[in-house]
């Protein structure tokens, strides 16, 4: 399942497409078009949050849940942002962190109903990526004045700095749950 995005122009998109292993199919669209969003969960139970609503740095706090058929707006993030990272395996429990405008360190926990501010990242940054669950996660990369290789792990209560990436990058993709996972791509 993929959703949102940005096309030259610039314009943000609300399209959602699902993949069945062979082909992509257009399904019900997001309620609000955005890019720079974060999301987690399988095809049947996903959540996404934040984003940029106009491709010009207009941070959003909106969240939407996917039930396998359609999106529904749900409780907003406490802090509007885009280019944020996160972790989670379904729409009932997730974690989001970092983001822009001006790099943010905020971390918020999703309990299936609302977002709660919890312990901040040690280093605030945008274009951060992560993987894991809401109680055991990894946050990495990001771009301050230059791409960063910072890595922090979350134990359900606080963040701890750990070994950096070999090469600092931003806008990475990621997958996995701790103790193993991977990050890839990025300029």
Regions found by a protein language model. Give the residues of each.
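Polar, enzyme-active/binding microenvironments
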Residues: 1-187
């Amino acid at each position: 399942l993929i959703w949102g995005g940005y096309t030259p122009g610039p314009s943000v998109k609300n399209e959602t497409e699902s993949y069945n292993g062979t082909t992509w199919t257009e399904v019900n669209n997001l309620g609000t078009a955005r890019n720079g969003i974060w999301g987690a969960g399988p095809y049947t139970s996903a959540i996404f949050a934040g984003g940029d609503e106009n491709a010009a740095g207009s941070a959003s706090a909106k969240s939407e849940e996917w039930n396998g058929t359609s999106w529904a707006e749900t409780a907003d993030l406490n802090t509007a942002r885009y280019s944020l990272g996160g972790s989670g395996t379904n729409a009932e429990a997730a974690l989001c962190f970092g983001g822009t405008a001006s790099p943010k360190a905020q971390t918020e926990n999703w309990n299936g109903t609302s977002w709660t501010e919890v312990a901040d990242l040690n280093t605030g940054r945008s274009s951060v990526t992560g993987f894991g669950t809401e109680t055991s996660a990894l946050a990495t990369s990001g771009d301050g004045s230059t791409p960063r290789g910072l890595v922090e792990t979350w134990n359900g209560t606080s963040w701890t700095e750990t070994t950096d990436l070999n090469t600092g990058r931003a806008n990475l993709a990621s997958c996995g749950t701790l103790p193993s996972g991977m990050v890839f791509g990025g300029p």
